[in-house]
């Protein structure tokens, strides 16, 4: 029996969790309980594959115009609720605890002296693995947000370390095989940027069509830009059609 915690701040964690849920479902002797945090329960989507999943507030980050805002992040934290959730999470029924950078499960395991397996991209960011830049806040978050005993890091390259490649959900491809990519159609996924600014930039590019996904967007056509709310099926279909991708996050994209 496994407790599997998933950080819900970014959709890459959810994509990876869906792939893992499909893989683990092939072993009927294994029972998996899923716990998600990092966004409101109502903002999670396409959760049918996780059964009676649990929700906690957890820890998340406030962003604006593509950057983490430390002061706004501190203001939105609920440390009392986090500590209560961490103390009340009973791990005795579970044989294994897994955390994809999910803090409630990770800290509950540390408090109860249980080994927690960390599976995710953040666990690949060890000394010796290149990073674009280092800052004190980012290093602190990586160390303290969801500490684990056993690390299984995922990255595009191993850089001489025991790292695994990204987990891709091959079963989620559209039925009927891959679509023919349109040579001048691009998928745009910039969920932490100002969407109106991005749309204005894209509409100024002639001869191209853009399918833009992001939180808070509605399905509408705005010139050469088709906006969409985030959804698994529509996103994968647009990805199949696109010949180019514009993104600054989404590790499993």
Question: How would you label these PLM feature ranges?
Answer:
Residues 7-8, 30-81:
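Conserved nucleotide-sugar phosphate-binding/catalytic loop shared by glycosyltransferases and other
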Residues 127-195, 213-216, 233:
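A nucleotide-sugar donor-handling region in carbohydrate enzymes
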Residues 110-127:
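Active-site proximal beta-strand in glycosyltransferases
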Residues 5-18:
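A short, glycine/small-residue-rich beta-strand->loop->alpha-helix junction that serves as a flexible
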Residues 67-104:
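Conserved nucleotide-sugar donor-binding subdomain of glycosyltransferases
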